[in-house]
Regions:
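Ribokinase/PfkB-type carbohydrate-kinase core domain
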Residues: 1-28, 33-34, 40-196
Length: 196
């Protein structure tokens, strides 16, 4: 199978961001204070998550990407035992803090060929701004690809929606006009009634 590099595009990426922080260590004893393991940290690995991961993937295609994310960065700390590979604990920080809000402005759309939205429903992308963006892009023939955890997707009129099977079952409202791609795990991807 051959892979063709996409032509150079100017991409606007909008979404929520996080840092995925992996704490690797060992648990060799139980705490005398409570019946819990004592974790001794050996190594930390930090990865960009949510929209920042999408940003890195788009850059790998040598695309010109402008990334706009909320002010608050969620941190997801995962504690993993080296020996057993057991995921012991996850601690989320800044999960409920107020984030800046995206406000649609046509001036940010100069030279944009494509919009990608990575919405984890953390408060950065409010429906009215998403509706304005979707309407503008439809009028200008700019494709909008959306991966959203919102249960009401009606603000993404005329967009291409990508959700997973669990999210699909939780959505309460869709736009009037849209394309839908549903990822179904190892089975592949569902599009217009066909599995790919």
């Amino acid at each position: 199978m051959s892979f063709q590099q996409p032509k150079s595009l100017n991409v606007l990426l909008l979404g929520d961001s996080c840092l995925d922080i992996y704490h690797y260590g060992s648990c060799n004893r139980i705490s005398p204070e409570a019946p819990v393991p004592v974790f001794v940290e050996d190594e930390i690995e930090v990865r960009h998550g949510m929209a920042l991961n999408v940003y890195l993937n788009l850059l790998a295609f040598n695309l010109a990407v402008e990334c706009m994310v909320g002010d608050t960065q969620v941190e997801k700390h995962r504690y993993i035992d080296f020996k057993s590979k057991q995921h012991l604990l996850r601690v989320d920080l800044n999960e409920d803090e107020e984030t800046g809000v995206f406000r649609f402005d046509e001036r940010t759309m100069a030279d944009v060929d494509l919009v990608v939205i990575s919405d984890y429903n953390k408060g950065f992308l409010h429906p009215p701004a998403c509706s304005s963006l979707a309407r503008y892009c439809f009028d200008k023939n700019i494709p909008v690809f959306v991966d959203s955890k919102k249960k009401d997707l009606s603000c993404f009129e005329n967009c291409i929606l990508k959700i997973n099977k669990n999210e699909y079952e939780e959505v309460v409202q869709y736009p009037n006009n849209y394309d839908l791609i549903v990822t179904v795990g190892a089975e592949g991807t569902l599009y217009k009634g066909e599995i790919y």
